[in-house]
Amino acid sequence: MKKSPLPVQNVQSSDKNVAGKEALVKLLRWHFGHADFRGKQLEAIQAVVSGRDCFCLMPTGGGKSICYQIPALAKPGIVLVVSPLIALMENQVMALKEKGIAAEYLSSTQATHVKNKIHEDLDSGKPSVRLLYVTPELIATKGFMLKLRKLHSRGLLNLIAIDEAHCISSWGHDFRPSYRQLSTLRDSLADVPVLALTATAAPKVQKDVIDSLNLRNPLVLKSSFNRPNIFYEVRYKDLLDNAYTDLGNLLKSCGNICAIIYCLERTTCDDLSVHLSSIGISSAAYHAGLNSKMRSTVLDDWLSSKKQIIVATVAFGMGIDKKDVRMVCHFNIPKSMESFYQESGRAGRDQLPSRSVLYYGVDDRKKMEYLLRNSENKKSSSSKKPTSDFEQIVTYCEGSGCRRKKILESFGEEFPVQQCKKTCDACKHPNQVAHCLEELMTTASRRHNSSRIFITSSNNKTNEGQYSEFWNRNEDGSNSNEEISDSDDATEAANSVTGPKLSKKLGLDEKLVLLEQAEEKYYERNKQVKKSEKNAISEALRDSSKQRLLDALTRVLQLLACVEEIDSQKGSEFLENECYRKYSKAGKSFYYSQIASTVRWLGTASRDELMTRLSSVVSLAREQEPLEEPLLATEPVENIEEEDDGKTNTVESRVDEPTQELVVSPILSPIRLPQVPSFSEFVNRRKIKQNTLIDKSSEGFDDKKPAKIMKLQ
């Protein structure tokens, strides 16, 4: 029910009393139902209401939105809120409207008539909207900036609040170039106070945000980063028999809780979700590889508690306000302490006891290092996130000290270990953690012939030639196809064969010689390091790929309600054979990438697309249907005689034995094609054939026939 605006009017009756604590608390209780302000909320509100710039650093769940929602009620006019995500704007506007507060948002997803209605209200003599949420991209447009200037000239723009302000800094873990353009707000709207809010910002990020926004003598407020209601724990994959099983047992032991599981790769999200569902845990995968309709369904099911667990890439979570999340699990190591803190902080927003669990694996660490190094090489000029930031989270996992202390120290906050009060595994079970670290050291030394497992030992090339498909924030934002970073071996192979730039002036024979030499050099180098064996596609890999496709196809068939029309087993075998035929000679990396691409295609395919691609399997299933009915007869067959060229073959069935059900399945014998010769083999065979023909022609043919044969050849 819409609340009466009387308390707001009473507060506005006296400008002197607008920033008073009593009036502000009255607004808080009336509109939001809270007894009092928390942390630095009151100081931030009083600063911006009095017209002063403010930089406010509050932990996730600390109530940052109150800092600009109360000022919108305390004074007439409009508060402009800049938000990075449309989902965040939608959620907050919906919540405010339910409380009777006039709020709107402008985005590209809205219908034209809705946007026109909002613009008409802004142009009216007395706009009804109190909070207007916009994206940084909209502010960058000339038309909207002109509208803001008009509102300002009419005295209707009270405050500019920039949520998730760390996005403006290239030092931050969530840098967005569009945020960088917000510095123009100070030039155009000089006397409007600016409130910058963030939950995660290291000291260098804080300074960068303040400088970039041109904040003038801002009040800098920093709440403690400590989340005392969260228990921090690290589990070591290298010491577990099966990380999937361990996670499943952990979730079962916690009961029917709401949780988020973050994964580095989309395929891991799919596989882990299937595993959890198979053991009776209600879960769903969420990532940009799914179409928008499926993502929306999964999100709604999780928010409404129809789904217990959501397994997602790290793009998920910003702007999602679900207070009863009891556990956040990182199934792969995050890229920085900032990322880990923000993501784990999505647990326990209701201040009730919650849990953060990080599954640490040496191989996962190597993958993340590989990703960060590639990112630095590609974006050395714009990206300021060196691998040194990654060292903090590695130390968090590989160190034996208090986890909470390491988190807070990374943000420049001193924290006595005694205050942890056994709210992390290192303080609660120090001997057990120390034993695990010793065992991890031994295991890593045995596997990698090195006694060092810290990041400084990562410069070796142990992960070369491995396939990987890393999550990319930009790709998730644009819903584009995911890139697969193929192995260095595959790239080298392509460069080796196609490396020589063949001039058009060269003759055919010279080009053939150059290509032949390049190929021989490549294959000779491969023989030396045995890369050909390393890159071979084993039967075990094919079996695991079939199982992966089977799981994905089964899930999609259930969603599309076409289980009866397509045999999931035969469909998965068909798709795997398709990938194997195309990429068996290219090697394991290309083959596995194609399998991953097929799994992602299954997640986005429509019913018609699925039926078209698997048409042979569908038609095969339909052909088999009429054959199955007669075979279910239970009457025994006595004697069947067949005559063939005068010979009688008798097929007897014993009446006293139970009749076995006959199953007729088409024999799909694989078509064995001749092996494709390499380029060198092809050239050599060609020369041998030419020499043979010349020898034969010299025995009994005249001089013209060899030339004719060669011409035909």
Curated annotation (Swiss-Prot):
Q: Write down the CDD domains for this protein, in alphabetical order.
A: DEXHc_RecQ, SF2_C_RecQ
Q: What is the effect of changing K64M?
A: Loss of ATPase or helicase activity
**Required co-factor?**
Mg(2+); Mn(2+)
Q: What is its main location?
A: nucleus
Q: Which GO terms describe its biological process?
A: DNA recombination
In this chain, the stretch annotated as Disordered covers: 465-499, 638-657, 694-713
Q: Where in the cell is it found?
A: Nucleus
Domain named Helicase ATP-binding: which ranges? 45-219
Q: Which GO terms describe its molecular function?
A: 3'-5' DNA helicase activity; ATP binding; ATP hydrolysis activity; DNA/DNA annealing activity; four-way junction helicase activity; helicase activity; metal ion binding
Per its record, the protein catalyses: Couples ATP hydrolysis with the unwinding of duplex DNA by translocating in the 3'-5' direction; ATP + H2O = ADP + phosphate + H(+)
Q: In which tissues is it expressed?
A: Expressed in roots, seedlings, young leaves, shoots, shoot apical mersitem, inflorescences, flowers, siliques and seeds.
PROSITE patterns (alphabetical): HELICASE_ATP_BIND_1, HELICASE_CTER
The UniProt family comment states: Belongs to the helicase family. RecQ subfamily.
Instruction: Give the protein's recorded name.
Output: ATP-dependent DNA helicase Q-like 3
